[in-house]
Amino acid sequence: MSETHFSSVKRKILRDVRQNPLTFPPSFPFTVSVLTLSDLPSVYSLCLGNPLYYKHLNCPLTPDLVQSDFTALPPGKNCEDKYFLGFCKNSSLAAVMDLVFGYPDEKTVYIGFFMVDRQLQGKGTGSLIISHTADILQRQSYRFMKLAWVEGNRQSE
C-alpha cells in the first residue's frame, strides 16, 4: 500500500463516525460500535492482556502496532469496506473485531483481527460473538466468513 493511500485511510478513520454494519438482536449481551482511533487506548489495553498472541507473532506489542490494525487493508479493498468493531459489556471493552466486507470475494467477509479480553476467554465469549456475527452476515446474503489466525497460537484454535 502506498504511503499516500495509507495516510488518507488513517485520516478518514480518525474523523469518520460510521454506522455499525451489523444489527445484533436486543438479547445480545454486548453493545457493539464502530471503533475509531480515539478508542486506541482501550484497544491497546485489551491487547496488553493477550501477550501470547504477540509472542506468536514474534512482534512486540506497541500502540503503533495496534493502530496499524485499524488501518490495514487487504489488496483491492478500501476503507469503506472495513469496520473495526468493539464489543462492550458494562462499559468495558470485551472484544474487538476487524471486518472487511467482500474479501477475498463479494460473498465473503474477512475477519483479519479478533481478540477477546483475557478475563472473558474460555467462557464462550468469543464463540458467542462469532456465531452471532455469522448469523447476521448470512442474513445479509454473505455466504462465507473467513477468520485469520496465527498458526501455533493455542488460544485461537
Predicted regions mapped to residue ranges:
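Conserved GNAT acetyl-CoA-binding A-motif
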Residues: L137-W149
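Glycine-rich acyl-CoA binding loop
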Residues: G122-S127
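Conserved binding-pocket/active-site segment within a compact domain
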Residues: R118-Q121, E157
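Conserved beta-strand-loop-alpha-helix junction that forms the acyl-donor binding cleft
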Residues: L147-E157
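Acetyl-CoA-dependent GNAT
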Residues: F6-F30, V34-L40, S45-Q119, I130-H132, ...
